[in-house]
Amino acid sequence: MDVDRQSIQRYIYLADDDSDDRDFFADAMLEIDPHVILKQAHDGMYLMDNLLRLSNSELPEFIFLDINMPRKSGLECLEEIRNHNGTLKEVNVIMLSTSSDPENIQKAMELGATFYAVKPSSFEKLKSLLDDILNMNLVSTFQEKRKFLFV
């Protein structure tokens, strides 16, 4: 773990309808940064209801969204987040999905996702992916569209 990370309290939100995937993510995040505050949503509607109640100072640094969720998909959440009038639209939104369908990737990019990653198949790969995301300069990565997809 980086020394700098110990002094930074990170707040992250994960929306995924699969409880096993949420647990997998939480365990990986805990190993990467035991000080992270991770909030979880079981679907997009629950996520948006909670995000819209937060003050600007309570907004997460990152929102990780699964694409295929009941009631409101990750892409619908992304669109709502980016169309929000407040600072919510400035939050880093990472699409984390099993889908590597070019149409989903293109749609996420068009809607303003900060990054798109295909869910890794192993715990170690997930830890590596999350560590990379937490440490990268997302503004410059987003500006360089060729780095948009991380598989």
Q: Where in this protein do the model-derived segments appear?
A:
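A Lys-centered signature of the CheY-like receiver
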Residues: 119
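Conserved sequence signature across two-component system core domains
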Residues: 15-16, 25, 41, 63
